[in-house]
Amino acid sequence: DLSRLFASYSSVLYARLQGFMNYMENGDNASRAVISYIDYVNRTSNGVFQKLNVMIDADQTVSMRYHSPSNTVYFKSLEDYSDRTLYEEIIHALQRVVYSDYWEVPFNIEFEAKLIMDYMSFVNGGEGNTEMALNMKYAKAELKNGRSMTLSEWIKANAYSNLDVDDYRQFLSVWKTIPAEYQNYMMSLRSQ
């Protein structure tokens, strides 16, 4: 049921969004957990996950993006659409709910979405986003733990193929040194 997540969408995306929703509702545990969390948010007063608009707009300057004010995921073309990128944009929409006014802090948001997707992929035996994360705009931001290592350097030093749960927990301990308003709600729960 597309109405569970989407308010509106470009008609050419209908079949792809149907496949995406089928996967989210019936796929791996991580995908079902995201849907369950969205349902939880919508049942509580903690925040409201607004249904997304998913549009194709050839005038976009990038292949895809999440536009917060309109709660819209834009793809430049049908060829730019992928379930993986839509999944990440849904993570951004959830971050907006969890962080409220703080969600646009660039140090945190893009890297955190990659880390969440990496962790969910790891749990399900898949590959991660390490290479994608290395190329992101804010990858040069310094970790806020008194070390001079950048996010890119940390990822390279701890390449996805070498990471295990203990490595993620170690990084999480560093992540928790970031001021409280920027901490990752979902990942901090996972480490407890």
Segment roles from a protein language model:
Residues 39-80:
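Catalytic zinc-binding patch centered on the HExxH motif and its immediate surroundings
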Residues 70, 90, 110:
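Extracellular structured ligand-interaction cores
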Residues 69-76, 94-104:
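Substrate-binding clefts and substrate-entry loops adjacent to catalytic sites
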Residues 84-97:
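Active-site recognition of the HExxH zinc-binding catalytic motif
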Residues 26-33, 37-46:
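Extended amphipathic alpha-helical coiled-coil/heptad-repeat regions
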Residues 79-87, 106-113:
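Solvent-exposed, acidic/flexible segments
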Residues 1-25, 103-192:
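Active-site or metal-binding loop neighborhoods of secreted/extracellular toxin and effector enzymes
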